[in-house]
């Protein structure tokens, strides 16, 4: 999908992305999104088997990847040649939020803060690079937008009928 194609047919920009996540055991699950398998698990100190990043780490990875794409596309739009982009993405989370029922804690289960540090080696003055990073990381990143602005999430139960024996 190109910008010109979206100018001609704006409705074609509306997408529904989807995948399937299956529980394996304990805290280990596997997601299938397009043709990509993504494992998730918890660390051993919180009852997992450490067979993949935990879900909050996957959110940080998605944020870092999304900002990287936004920076690369923004630089290309401006004719700026990039030599490298590197991001450090970190988030503060209080596990009492996840275990709040057991601990009677009044703490959110999600991140309290997320910080992204970006290093860019580019053929452009520092002010131009800063503008590209701002545009790529704040203006056009869908993941940044989802984390900054509330998005309705609906969890619906579909009861499986046990197989006949």
In which residue ranges do the predicted regions lie?
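Extended beta-strand/beta-hairpin segments
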Residues: 1-61, 73-165
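Alpha-helical metal-binding/catalytic segments enriched in His/Glu/Asp
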Residues: 63-67
């Amino acid at each position: 999908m190109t910008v010109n194609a979206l100018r001609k047919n704006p409705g074609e920009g509306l997408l529904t992305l989807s995948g399937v996540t299956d529980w394996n055991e304990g805290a280990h699950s596997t997601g299938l999104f397009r043709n990509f398998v993504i494992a998730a698990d918890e660390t051993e100190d919180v009852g997992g088997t450490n067979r993949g990043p935990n879900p909050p780490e996957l959110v940080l990875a998605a944020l870092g990847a999304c900002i990287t794409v936004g920076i690369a596309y923004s630089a290309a739009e401006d004719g700026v040649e990039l030599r490298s982009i590197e991001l450090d993405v970190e988030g503060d989370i209080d596990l009492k939020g996840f275990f709040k029922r057991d601990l009677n804690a009044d703490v959110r289960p999600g991140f309290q803060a997320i910080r992204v540090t970006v290093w860019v080696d580019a053929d452009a003055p520092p002010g131009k690079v800063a503008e590209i990073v701002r545009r790529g990381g704040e203006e056009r990143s869908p993941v940044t937008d989802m984390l900054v602005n509330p998005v309705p999430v609906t969890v619906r139960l579909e009861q499986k009928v046990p197989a006949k024996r």
